Amino acid sequence: MKQSKMLIPTLREMPSDAQVISHALLMRAGYVRQVSAGIYAYLPLANRVLEKLKNIMREEFDEIGAVELLAPSLLTADLWRESGRYDTYGEDLYKLKNRDNSDFILGPTHEETMTSLVRDEITSYKKLPLNVYQIAPKFRDEKRPRYGLLRGREFLMKDGYSYHADQDSLDETYNDYKKAYEKIFERAGLNFKPIIADAGAMGGKDSQEFIAITDDRINLEKWLVLSKNITSIEEIPESVLSEIKEELGKWLIAGEDTIVYAEGGDYAANIEMASSQFEPNVAYTEELELEKVATPGAKTIDEVSKFLEIDEEQTVKTLVYHADDELVVVLLNGNDQLNEVKLTNYLGASFIEAASEAEVEEKFGAHFGSLGPIGLENVKIIADRKVEQIKNAVVGANVDGFHYKNANFGRDYEVEEFVDLRTVNEGEISPDGRGTLKFARGIEIGHIFKLGTRYTEAMNANILDANGRSIPMLMGCYGIGVSRLLSAILEQFARIYVEKTPREEFKFSWSINFPKELAPFDIHLVPVNVKDEAAMELTSELEEKLRGKGYQVLVDDRNERAGVKFADSDLIGLPVRVTIGKKAAEGVVEVKIRATGEVVEINKDELVNTIEILSK
């Protein structure tokens, strides 16, 4: 492929509006262009990478018996009314009307559409399981699209759906998808973790996310590729390393997910679902007499603890939430934070919201800083399981400026149930006891769900089972953010190339270091002077030879300065660059391996073998 025939509009500088390195490099290297806020055009290079990702997915899904189809993006609202999501999905849903004033949506996901297709065609358990998927655009009206392809209004997604007559069949397909996802992300070269996740608005029971880790900003060696005349990172002057660290610090760590994993163990979960080992305290502590004390001006846990000269561990804080139409009081250890997802899941609520200060004062006669569980009536009280173990606790007295000392569950107040409601902290023990918990940031690149009958029951997607009974099909759904994957790959494979000039000066620049299986082309042939007849003849000869060996080759046939060509080649990030320069008449070329920075000068007859050896 001739570079002059392709649309690769590289930029000399990073775009000023980019906040994460993946967005900046995709724009600067000419992979994408923004058409509107949150909407991007995938230019030829990006499209080639996406096609390679799609083909990897197709190969792995073929292995598990998943069949590809293509559903429309413009969907009737009637199906979403059947499932109940038309009015509950929220403002992210694109709603529109046709000329007949009928309601339609642009699909953010396709559970309803697929279920309607299946219910019209399958009526017996004998035709199940069915496992289908598509790779197609999705739409969400993001209030604040940002971070390039990571949070857009239109995005490319692989969404799969499976239908089953029994739980064993659903479990088997769910596990097949988990293994297929792991193979896909491994082939993409990603550092990722499968984690326990919340099903959220999708509904259903079991759920697992796949997160690409993005928060490594400390390990400089991971980011740097050194030129052949730099032997180690220690050779780089401290002033240059400081500049590199400053450059790294300009870019936000991509990914809005915090994951929790066990260092030295297998446990991993989203922060919303993570728990730690809970060991009941069996030691006996004498219950002291309840005492009401003045705490003037002390409204926070920190202020109360300091005023009473106690540890925060000895306090219980009281929170108030609306859960659908019910008011709920939640008790936590004073130095813990409430995990709202755990609270939502425990209550089975579709909506929770913290009560306002005014509501609390009207209902309980005190502000939050003095609120406590003693004397509360006609309200549900639930507590984190740690609260049960706090003997002689300090709690609010439901009178502003006062607290109780020595409050004890069972004697002074009651709790409907003790459950895990807190957000875990780093350094705690994994729930399985194997390893301590660590936090990391990452990008969600895949998500699988066991939806059960969440959609099939609502939409009357029933079959006759082996006994002739009409039952709703069981359902699973399985998503991969394909365009997100492109950003995740760049977040992990962006590199800073450091070179030492003949004048012993150190320079550095950003480069993309695509994994071999995903690079838009395998090899970049760069003739330095397109007016040099010998160089162009050798370029054509090498292109033909390399293509004959199965390599995908991009030839920079532009009449540009050598510096421009090399800068663009570094930005584009193909695994191998072959430079045809002044020694073309002698049949000598220069080979540069992107991943290692290694550069060798070889005879043209050694090119294929050299590339195979150096690329391993």
UniProtKB/Swiss-Prot annotation:
Enzyme nomenclature, EC number: 6.1.1.15
Q: Which GO terms describe its biological process?
A: prolyl-tRNA aminoacylation
Q: Name one GO molecular function term.
A: catalytic activity, acting on a protein
Query: According to its UniProt record, which reaction does this protein catalyse?
Result: tRNA(Pro) + L-proline + ATP = L-prolyl-tRNA(Pro) + AMP + diphosphate
Location of the protein in the cell: Cytoplasm
Q: Which GO terms describe its cellular component?
A: cytosol
Question: CDD domains from the xrefs?
Answer: ProRS-INS, ProRS_anticodon_short, ProRS_core_prok
Is the Nucleus keyword given for this protein? no
Asked if the keyword Cell membrane belongs to this entry, the reply reads no
Q: What is its main location?
A: cytoplasm
InterPro entries annotated for this entry?
A: aa-tRNA-synt_IIb, aa-tRNA-synth_II, aa-tRNA-synth_II/BPL/LPL, Anticodon-bd, Anticodon-bd_dom_sf, Pro-tRNA-ligase_IIa, Pro-tRNA-synth_IIa_bac-type, Pro-tRNA-Synthase_IIa_type1
UniProt keywords, alphabetically: Aminoacyl-tRNA synthetase, ATP-binding, Cytoplasm, Ligase, Nucleotide-binding, Protein biosynthesis
* Family statement: Belongs to the class-II aminoacyl-tRNA synthetase family. ProS type 1 subfamily.
Domain remarks in the Swiss-Prot or TrEMBL record: Consists of three domains: the N-terminal catalytic domain, the editing domain and the C-terminal anticodon-binding domain.
Function field? Catalyzes the attachment of proline to tRNA(Pro) in a two-step reaction: proline is first activated by ATP to form Pro-AMP and then transferred to the acceptor end of tRNA(Pro). As ProRS can inadvertently accommodate and process non-cognate amino acids such as alanine and cysteine, to avoid such errors it has two additional distinct editing activities against alanine. One activity is designated as 'pretransfer' editing and involves the tRNA(Pro)-independent hydrolysis of activated Ala-AMP.
The subunit field of the Swiss-Prot or TrEMBL record says: Homodimer.
Q: What is this protein called?
A: Proline--tRNA ligase
State the species of origin: Lactococcus lactis subsp. lactis (strain IL1403)
